[in-house]
């Protein structure tokens, strides 16, 4: 049943307007990051690492939360129309399978987005910044860590989009979560807030590894928030009053 749900969610993406955002926002982030790097070469002297911080800081703080929030709101949009929610609750499909299917689809989109961001990073580094060689192997590791941290954000946004029928409000809350995440991280409490995890994983504001010696705690926090969001979704779906 879960596989059928995933296939159904994937069909929603065919000719979807969210693909325009998928391409535009990472390109805007890359343009801004590259421009900022080239304008501050006297300060940003750490080559690929410095360019990485400029490319990923605003991406992880603004662009990615906005994209994930939009992905989640778009996938729940059909269920919130008319009496569709009542039909879903009466169907033989386990409600949590529906949530898990949406999670799988948004996670796939996040993986594609991260891959596109990294491709733009390498392209800008070679063509515009003219950096020597290839990016250090630690940078793809940062990307994978960021994807792990992103899973908590995805689950949180799917819960918000599930309980809030408005399309815009969950997106606003996602942006707010990303902004508060940078402040919480700066105070040293990033592992306690799901919207900080992706920023920490991407190492988006420092050249030095911010998670050195804390990989276990980071992974635990990501999995804990992910499990908490799935548990919350399960409880809400069991009550069958999300539409209200």
Regions from the language model: what does each represent?
Residues 75-107:
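Helix-loop-helix units of permease transmembrane domains in multi-pass membrane transporters
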